[in-house]
Amino acid sequence: MSVAAENQDSATMYEVMKGTVSAREAIQHTPSCDIIPANTILAGIEQELHNVGKEMTLREKLRDEQTGVAEEYDYILIDCPPSLGLLTVNALTAADYLLIPTMAETFAASGITQLYDTYKSVKKYTNPALRIDGVLLTRTERTRVTKTIQELTGKIANYMGADVYRTTIRSNVIIKEAQAVQENVFDYIESKAHRG
């Protein structure tokens, strides 16, 4: 969602993962959703988590009886970086379902198969209840290339026992603009409408 912390002193997912603040304390409320923002410092958490069971850290932070927030929400979306490191493993371990967003680009298909391998490992060792909900194509355009990639993605999804959503996210300058100003898309659209 590309949302930064409200200010430099706001707690982020980094502090939650490190254990210096609770998930509840880090939540920021926006008109459209509640978020726990992240920043580039979060990438360093992989070097800092040395404890046994480090792949369970996020699950424990979200589900803790005293300080967790999992029971307060119908849905919690965990937006992961495009890597398959400890942060992604933590997210998969904490999740009930895996929604795989993938760009409608040729090389993105190989990323799906790599993620599937990680999914199988997490399912085997840390979260046997994890299920693939589906594959969501992003940055689509009305071109033959996109249609070809949709077909390829469909074959890969079928191999994984998943479906490709009929809904896609088309290429849109508003998404890029929202990322540039570090706002979630919904708030950005609303603020843009008020600006005229």
PLM feature spans:
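P-loop NTP-binding core
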Residues: 1-196
